[in-house]
Amino acid sequence: MRIFQAFTVAALLLTAPSARADYHVVSPSEVDLGELEIEHNGAASFDHLPANSGAQSDTLELGTGLTSWWHSEIELGFDRDSGQNQPTLLTQLVWENTFQLSEPGEYWADVGVFAEYGQSMTRGPHAGANEVTFGPAIAKDIGRTTNTINLFLTRQLGPDQTSQGLDVSYAWQTKYNLSEHFSPAVEIYGDAGELGRSPALSQQQLLIGPVAIGAWKLRDLGLGNAGKLKYELGWLFGTTPASPNGTLRWRLEVEIPF
């Protein structure tokens, strides 16, 4: 029943225009019923060529668990293109959803579905397409590691499309569960281009690097009696000519029970 309900809701999302991809690996268990989440994701790229450096992406998000298996967020996305003297623009208004299809440990791997709807907020020379993104999020514990993979398809919609195919993106995280406050991880982010028409690997974006992940109870920080502050901080190395030399990525999230 849960799988049928999740796919029904996800199918409804696909009839609407998704947001740009953030450097964050989606867990199939990101469902926190009874908690309010305030989240910020950011990424900044650096390159030896000024024309390829300076791109930045930031999000502000508000989310909660709508049911025991459905987590939903509303997000504002801000972007700055690479190059000198580029403006920072509010580019997307996003509805982001994660559907948990199995309980952690119930099957060989934990499985979820991710679906996003994004409406472009830009016009004129900076106009961008609306997008819808959909795909599986799968996680598997092996020893003290948690291994998570995302495989997403994105379709552009609206009058400002630059592609009419399905774009394929993927992400991988292997995290060593050392402690609540600090766990090291390795992440991979790639964009393979249009499904069935992928360019050579050298022309695809592929980033790999270390990430620190952890959480602190708010009461331990003197900020209240309940809730958590979660963080992620990493450096991603570009491995192809189409990728920036390096990308700094960060994430802060405050969880408040209600």
Segments from the language model and where they lie:
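Transmembrane beta-barrel domains of Gram-negative outer membranes and organellar outer membranes
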Residues: 20-258
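N-terminal signal peptide c-region/cleavage motif recognized by signal peptidases
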Residues: 16-18
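Repetitive helical segments and hydrophobic/amphipathic motifs
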Residues: 11-14
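Sec-dependent signal peptide recognition
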Residues: 2-9
